[in-house]
């Protein structure tokens, strides 16, 4: 499932995966690996409807559900055996049967005593497996497994670990906790715990948002400064709109660029005050772009806001180096009120038309 040749793969069937096709892979690369693939356009409304139906089934088992995406979630079934008259394993088996019967969908279940192990177990036997990692079996199960099983250990992290002689959980277990932290920072301390099957994160139905971002892939690679500037402003507006809707602000602005050769370039700047203003987000991202220089052509441009905090902390002191910033902020708030009353196109900036 994916878009045109300049899009990316949303997901792939298991036959395509055998040939090397993966989610988020550029479509042109996927078609080289699997030239006879049938490309299906995404049907987001259908996926959202199915996700909501499955979520309703989950809520009949427990209120403690933490969604990860449309098709994946953590559930905490602690203490529910008496309520349902059956242990969690039985209730989860009934859930997957109900999904097949009512929705025609399969699901993979991973059951364990913490989130890390449940995630590992859910990936063991897709597309419709059921794997359990018991507390007593944790160490023996993990010992010979590769560290790439750890959620978040991608190719770059795996290469760094291999340079340190760490390829398996057994290798991790041989490292002293302080040595791991000294070499890999906070990630090293996390790895020390995960190597022992320890994960104290709770299932949270209201996990805080960590970042807000927007990006676009161009139909054709471009180095046109006006076109890039127009897109950057529109993305800053979208990020700002989402921050305002969530009553959030952020202290870190990130710029993301992907060149024609698919190499990624990312830059970020920390602001003195958190912001939710499109003008501040745009000017910060534009400054990062100017520092990079126009090394295009580019195939992708992105803008993001992170280190999120309540909007009450936003835009407090103004910018002493830019006295006009306060007036621009006031003008933006006024424009927001006009759009709220008359619609999103009631007032536009000229650069948004580029």
Set out the residue ranges of the language-model regions.
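Short aromatic/hydrophobic contact patches that present stacked aromatics
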Residues: 38, 74, 254, 270, ...
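DNA-contacting surface of Y-family translesion DNA polymerases
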Residues: 142, 149, 157-298
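Acidic, metal-coordinating catalytic segment for phosphate/diphosphate chemistry
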Residues: 158, 273-354
């Amino acid at each position: 499932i994916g878009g045109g040749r300049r899009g990316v793969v949303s997901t792939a069937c298991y036959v395509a995966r055998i040939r090397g096709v993966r989610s988020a892979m550029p479509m042109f690369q996927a078609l080289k690996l699997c030239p006879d693939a049938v490309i299906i356009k995404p049907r987001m409304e259908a996926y959202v409807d199915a996700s909501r139906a499955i979520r309703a089934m989950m809520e009949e088992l427990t209120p403690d559900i933490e969604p990860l995406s449309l098709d994946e979630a953590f559930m905490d079934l602690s203490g529910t055996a008496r309520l349902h008259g059956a242990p969690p394993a039985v209730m989860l088996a009934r859930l997957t049967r109900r999904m097949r019967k009512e929705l025609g969908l399969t699901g993979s279940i991973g059951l364990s005593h913490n989130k890390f192990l449940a995630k590992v177990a859910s990936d063991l036997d897709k597309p419709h497996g059921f794997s359990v990692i018991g507390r007593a079996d944790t160490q023996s199960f993990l010992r010979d497994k590769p560290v790439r099983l750890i959620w978040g250990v991608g190719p770059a992290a795996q290469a760094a670990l291999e340079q340190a002689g760490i390829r398996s959980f057994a290798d991790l277990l041989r490292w002293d906790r302080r040595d791991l932290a000294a070499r890999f920072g906070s990630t090293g301390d996390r790895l020390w715990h995960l190597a022992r099957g320890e994960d104290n994160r709770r299932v949270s139905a209201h996990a805080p948002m960590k970042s807000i971002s927007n990006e676009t892939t161009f139909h054709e690679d471009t180095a046109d400064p006006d076109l890039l500037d127009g897109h950057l402003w529109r993305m800053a507006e979208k990020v700002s709109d989402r921050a305002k809707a969530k009553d959030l602000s952020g202290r870190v602005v990130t710029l993301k660029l992907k060149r024609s050769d698919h190499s990624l370039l990312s830059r970020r700047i920390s602001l003195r005050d958190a912001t939710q203003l499109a003008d501040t987000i745009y000017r910060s991202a534009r400054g990062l772009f100017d520092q990079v220089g126009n090394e295009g052509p580019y195939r992708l441009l992105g803008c993001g806001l992170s280190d999120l905090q309540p909007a009450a902390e936003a835009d407090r002191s103004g910018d002493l180096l830019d006295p006009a910033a306060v007036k621009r902020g006031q003008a933006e708030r006024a424009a927001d009120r006009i759009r709220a009353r008359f619609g999103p196109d009631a007032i536009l900036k000229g650069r948004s038309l580029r």
